[in-house]
Amino acid sequence: YQSEHGDYSLEAYFGKVTIGRFNARLIANLDVPQDELEALTSHAVKRVKTEEGSTRWTLNADKQQEQGSRKIRTLSYIPDYSKLDADYIRQRFGEPESFSVVNETTQLWVYPQLGVRILIDTHGRELFEYISPAQFKLLEEKK
């Protein structure tokens, strides 16, 4: 995956999973240096441009297998159910340490002590992202 800004990332998509009463998509963002990520694009069997301007590659089966031993940087959980409002999240996680407005329908709530960031979207699906607390500090420092 290459963002519209040119940064590369490697995601492992686990498809739909059921956790508790929620069906969700589970995605692991793997820890790979940028130069290695760029080199991996030559092993793609498929390339897709997204509406946002990013590019998504699908690696061949051998390269997918090789990358499976990488450390997980973040783990994203995207429930199919899209009615998880701020009150529901506040009841389960408490008040966020910080939050920011992403756009008119979306807020980012940050819980560094838990290693959790939550995108709350009033017109779409929520996204829960887990980052180890040690990595969370590094990620926040890069901003």
Predicted regions and their residues:
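A cross-family detector of function-defining hotspots
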Residues: Y1-K143
